[in-house]
Every structure is written in C-alpha cells, then in structure tokens.
Amino acid sequence: MPISSSSSSSTKSMRRAASELERSDSVTSPRFIGRRQSLIEDARKEREAAAAAAEAAEATEQIVFEEEDGKALLNLFFTLRSSKTPALSRSLKVFETFEAKIHHLETRPCRKPRDSLEGLEYFVRCEVHLSDVSTLISSIKRIAEDVKTTKEVKFHWFPKKISELDRCHHLITKFDPDLDQEHPGFTDPVYRQRRKMIGDIAFRYKQGEPIPRVEYTEEEIGTWREVYSTLRDLYTTHACSEHLEAFNLLERHCGYSPENIPQLEDVSRFLRERTGFQLRPVAGLLSARDFLASLAFRVFQCTQYIRHASSPMHSPEPDCVHELLGHVPILADRVFAQFSQNIGLASLGASEEDIEKLSTLYWFTVEFGLCKQGGIVKAYGAGLLSSYGELVHALSDEPERREFDPEAAAIQPYQDQNYQSVYFVSESFTDAKEKLRSYVAGIKRPFSVRFDPYTYSIEVLDNPLKIRGGLESVKDELKMLTDALNVLA
C-alpha cells in the first residue's frame, strides 16, 4: 500500500517542490551515463554461479557421499519409530557388519509423528568402504524410515576476528576508471594516477593501524566544496533529525566544512566514541559478502578518493563524498548503528541467495531509505543524502513510497541507471530494526552468531554450551542494570 506524501497540496508547496526539482536539474552535473555500482549486482552473479554448480552436481549424484582413498564418507539421515523395539540394535548391527567407522552421531525427537507413534531422527556421519555404500543404504532402509544421504553442509568462510578483515578485500572493478571507457575519469591520466596512489593506501592498510592521511589537491577540495555547499542547505528540510544532529557535531569536531575534506582517522575516532563503529580505508566497491561481513564487526569500509571534477554531483561508484556526507552522520546514531551491524551479522555464512536479498535490503534502507518524523517523511539513506537530485526526487510527489517491509524490500527490483521509482518508508529506526530482526530469523543457517564487543570477535553459537555462555554474560549485564535501578529507587 503506497504511503501518501505528507507535504501540503497547497499551491505554495507545489511551487516550492517544482522549484526544487528545477534547481535539482540545474545543479546536477552532466550525468555519468551507465550503470551505478551496487552490492546487489555482485551478489546476484555469485548466487547464479552457485546455483548452476549445484544443479550440475545434483544431476550426476544419487547416493551422496565424499570419496577419499577408497572410502566413502556418508552423511546419513533416518528415522526409527518406537514401535520397532529392536530397530536401534538392528541398525547398529548394519554398521557393524559393514565395518563402518562412525565419526558422529546425533538424535532428536521426530518432528512428524506418524500414526501416533513417536520416534527419533538420527544423523550419522560414517566412513565405509566404497564398494559397500549401496548395500549399507539398502540394509538401513529395511529397518528405518525416511532414509536419505546428503552432502556435508559447507558454508562460506567468514571472518571471526576483526584482524581477519584484512582478507576481505575483493573489489568489483568493472567501473574502474582504468577499465571502464564511460567512467568520467577514463580519459584523464592524472586522475587515474591519483586514484591508484590513494587506492594503494587501502591495499597496504592492516586492521588496527591509524588510517594514513591524504593531502587533497585544490581541484579535489573544489569538487567537495560544490557538493557540500549545495547539500548542506537542503539537509535542514530533507534530512532526518539524527543526520542533522550528527552533521553539526562533525562540523564542530571533525573538520567538516566546505573548505576541508575530513580525514578518515579523525572521523573514525569520532564514530568509535559515539557508537563503536570505525572506518577502514578501501580502494573501491567491495564484493557484497566482504562488505557486509565488515559491518558485523562495526567496521565501515570507506573510500578516500573523490569523484572526477567534471561530474561533481554524480558518481558511478562510492567515493569519499558519498561516504562522509551520506553514511558517516547516520552511523553516529546508536539505533541505526545496530541496524547496520545486524545486516552484517545476518550475512555471515549465508547462502548466495540470502546475500543477494540482504544486499537489496541494504540498498533500500541504508542507501535509499526514508523514515517518518513528526508525520513528515525524511531521508536517512546515504545515496539520497549525498545526491542533491535524488534527495529532491525522493521527497517529491513523483516516486512511489511504500511502508518498509523487509520481505518485500529484499526482492524489490532496483534502479541503477536513474532515480529510484520506489522507496520504502520506516516508522522509525527502532521499528526498522525490529522488522529486520524478524526477517533475519528466517534465514536458514544451522548456527547463530554473536559479536563480542570486548574481543572484537564473532562467536559461532552452534551448541547449547556456547549459548549458555552467552546467556551468562547477558545475565551479568541485567544484574548490573537491576542494581542501578535499585540505587535510584
């Protein structure tokens, strides 16, 4: 159900909107004609490649196992009903007969009782001679129900320590100024050399080091000044209150001004004190999986180079204008910072399909999200708050606006060649965070993850003992808060 615009329909408001749209056209520099880079396209290609590989494998396999040195490693599932009293001993006898070496065995109550008979579901990982695989399976089928074999579920590697983000550096290079003839900087050798020099800073960077400073040229500062001055005036009427509050603090404490491009190290320290987020230099657009994994550690991968001077109001790729004006201020809000980290945590070990959906969610929230404040729709997405034209467009009567629903947003077609035709509006950051939490609960992984803010590490919660340990730390925090309430009572 589209959400109607909260702006007045009076003649005065219509004139103002028309004036802003006209100004948008006048301040928008010659537009880069071509696709705008996004995490979604990268995630989609990875998902399609993985699906094709899986289909090819399934077409050639019946009984699924891994072969190693003449042995077959089987992951075997079956169900034994309670009416068959000797079934367990008979099934164990089968494994004994074929001299199967059992590596792992688990049981759980049967999820689907049949004819009022309860039972147990078994998972057995075992090793048996290659020539005995078919006969062993047939023997088990005579005793048990729902017998099937499956591949061991293998998940994509993901960083578990913040230092391992040094391995998350897979760049999407199709819009690189050295490679893309349509890039505004393709015919400018000076710009291309400058980009390479700044990019090398990111390639050499190791997690935990101070971020090296960049001495920006007069031309680069001029590009920054034009965008900064144009957008600063529009923020008072179009940006959400959280962005405005943080932007004022950044001007006071981090050198934000039309005449100065802030240094990432200064901004990173500011964010760390506010929400625990920190910046890390990156040479371009990361792969979706690597970028989202960084968010799980409250690390935002941030470029240091600036767009080409010929196109100050539009860039086909992320640059420091987009990051510093769009992303950084809103990451200074605690609720939004948690929302961003939750997307990152949900991506760890996720399938290619889920990575694509999470990337699309990121697109329609963190990049192009709108929210309600005092009954008025405001912008919080970085893609909006770093683009005069799209910011005016998003809050005009032209696009469709829908209530934020993660299920719908995750599969919504996106626009990477022009302004978005659809935007999603959240009631509040807290509401968006809770809706995301419900959505993430539906992502299929045989484990959950937890971020440890003391060690900057990810704990994989895949057994009751680990979960119990996490609950103990929560219990300690609750006890401390309860004591604090008692002191105030």
UniProtKB/Swiss-Prot annotation:
Which positions does the record annotate as the modified residue Phosphoserine?
Answer: S38
Q: Give the span(s) annotated as Disordered.
A: 1-29
Q: How is its activity regulated?
A: Phosphorylation leads to an increase in the catalytic activity.
Coiled-coil blocks: none
| Protein's gene | th
Cellular component GO terms, alphabetical: axon; cell body fiber; perikaryon; perinuclear region of cytoplasm
State the organism named in the record.
Oncorhynchus mykiss
Q: In which tissues is it expressed?
A: Expressed in the ventral brain, with highest levels in the olfactory bulb, low expression, if any, in other tissues.
Cofactors demanded by this protein: Fe(2+)
Could you tell me what reaction this enzyme catalyses? (6R)-L-erythro-5,6,7,8-tetrahydrobiopterin + L-tyrosine + O2 = (4aS,6R)-4a-hydroxy-L-erythro-5,6,7,8-tetrahydrobiopterin + L-dopa
State whether keyword Nucleotide-binding applies.
no
- Name listed for the protein in its UniProt record: Tyrosine 3-monooxygenase
